[in-house]
Amino acid sequence: MSVPTLSNKPENVDLLVLPHGEEKVKCQISDKGDCNIFTIKLEDHTIGNLIKQSLCQDPKVTFAAYRQPHPLQNVIEITIRPKGYAGVKLLSDNVHTILNQVSTLRETFVNKVQKYKEKNACHGNR
């Protein structure tokens, strides 16, 4: 007996590989002209929430939100209302901040694991 599949489910490769010639990020200005709306392909709630949280803590941002327009598409939209700053620069700066935080977290984790292994290796020799 075969397992039924969703007829509208995209192919796995379409969720992981950006087609040739397509842009990863597109920027639009909202109808009112006060917000930047960034459409980011091949991303989901994981990165959307991280970026939104970082933007919400940025004093140069009045408003930040994200949404995933459709659950079967790996596309998110991030909306930023900047306080007189370029939205593209704010997004870029906040993504770099997140990358630095993740890098620091990774280094700390690797160091702690190494210390744990060294400590247990010493105890194992007794």
Curated annotation (Swiss-Prot):
Main location: nucleus
Cellular-component GO terms for this entry: RNA polymerase II, core complex
UniProt-listed PANTHER family: DNA-DIRECTED RNA POLYMERASE I,II,III, DNA-DIRECTED RNA POLYMERASE II SUBUNIT RPB11
Domain of life, per lineage: Eukaryota
Name of the molecule in the record: Probable DNA-directed RNA polymerase II subunit RPB11
Pfam families hit by this protein: RNA_pol_L_2
InterPro entries to which the protein is assigned, alphabetical: RBP11, RBP11-like, RBP11-like_dimer, RNA_pol_Rpb11_13-16kDa_CS, Rpo11-like
Cell compartments where the protein resides: Nucleus
Keywords: DNA-directed RNA polymerase, Nucleus, Transcription
GO molecular function, one term: DNA-directed RNA polymerase activity
Family: Belongs to the archaeal Rpo11/eukaryotic RPB11/RPC19 RNA polymerase subunit family.
Gene: RPB11
Oligomeric form and interacting partners: Component of the RNA polymerase II (Pol II) complex consisting of 12 subunits.
Gene3D superfamilies xrefs: RNA polymerase, RBP11-like subunit
The keyword Transcription is assigned to this record: yes
Function, as annotated: DNA-dependent RNA polymerase catalyzes the transcription of DNA into RNA using the four ribonucleoside triphosphates as substrates. Component of RNA polymerase II which synthesizes mRNA precursors and many functional non-coding RNAs. Pol II is the central component of the basal RNA polymerase II transcription machinery. It is composed of mobile elements that move relative to each other. RPB11 is part of the core element with the central large cleft.
Lineage: Eukaryota, Sar, Alveolata, Apicomplexa, Aconoidasida
GO annotation (BP), single: transcription by RNA polymerase II
